[in-house]
Amino acid sequence: MRVGVVTVGEDSAQEVCDRLVQGGVEAIWSFAPGRVELPQGVMLKHAVIAGLVSQGADAADMGFCGYSAFEHGIRAFGYRGGMYIRMGDDAHSGEIVLCDGTGTELTGSCFRAFQQELKTGAVRPITTERLGIVQRVSGAAKSYDAHLNRLAQSVRSGPNGVTVLIGGNPETYDAVARVLLPCGYSVRYYTGLDSDKLFETAKEENTDLAFMADGMEGVMCAIAYGKHITRHELNAVLAMAAVKDGRANKLVLPADIPGEYVKQIADEGAEISVCPAKRSRWARAAIEAGAYLPELFEPEAKIIRAAELYLAGKLKEYLDGLPKVTINEKKVPCSWRDMGRVLRSFTEGERNEQIQLVDGVKVNVDKGWVLVRPDSGFTAYRVIAGSFDAEYSKELTDVYAGKLRAIAEDKEG
């Protein structure tokens, strides 16, 4: 979970560090800060390490690495938690992500508990406690490369004719290139930030696959066969391939993935459960269920597996085999104070046998489904509807958006 924006200069790094340590050292004993490169980030990292050590916590400096490598390192090296520092583009601000021992962000009640202790927790006296130990861990990136190489099934060979264009996070590009280039793929980096221009560039350069990746949130845009591939389509294809290859027989999927895709994957023999769609909660649920599939969560693994499916001729086969579901979405403004009342009234108005309460409220109807959930800023409700019938999908969106709007406007309800 993002603790907030840290601006080096307004608060000293040591003061930021002290406040973080006061709240977190009890819960996070063996701690691994990682991923900084700008001078301000390096200063903040060393201040955090100094504060942790002064409070008796052991700290492992994982150096500079991508977010997926950081998550993998937390799990592989057995740390109790971690802190990922990413500096902003302006070099004066950045964000800190706190992770637990599963390598996933602290969210919800876990974050609120940390935040509360951060504000009120006592500093343990250093005179009565041991000083922590600082360890330099230099193998995080190489360990993650080995993980990706095990995931890849291609053998080292000459050029295979497949060109992959990757934009966005440079660490994602570097990790993917280190795996795919020796296997004969052509891997290029796109320096722009606009997904639409990525599509144009991929078309102009006759690129087979193109991706816009964020190192923390995953693949934001995927292009193959001259068209955009939605994140749900890509996730469904990768999950289907893993089941058919015998790499997975149990999966955890996000609640907002179309039910038609879930049914098709389940028909292949997979045991499937659903969970909230937020990446950190989804990843944690998959890890706890023993159903973690790297390509569903790690952008590097996602790109590598998609490239290999393309090379094998299976990507198009799986994409063409997906049910043709049309998804529409609308937003209904709603005050955060009214969120609970509106959702409760909405749920009470639907038949019990039609609803699923996983990530908001999902209503299953005869020819489709509707998912109602708050947006990330808790300023509106998202109404997402899906159906084989495009017109019916739009109609569902309009009808349920109207229901929510009426409830939100009825202050007496």
Predicted segments, located by residue:
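Gly/Ser/Thr-enriched, mixed-charge loops and adjacent short helices
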Residues: 94-207
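Ser/Thr/Gly-rich flexible loops in soluble cytosolic domains mediating phosphotransfer, phosphorylation
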Residues: 34-49, 53-54, 101-136, 140, ...
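Phosphate-bearing ligand-interacting subdomains
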Residues: 1-46
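Glycine-rich phosphate-binding loop
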Residues: 7-8, 12-13, 27, 80-93, ...
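Phosphate-binding and adjacent anionic-ligand microenvironments
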Residues: 208, 225, 245-413
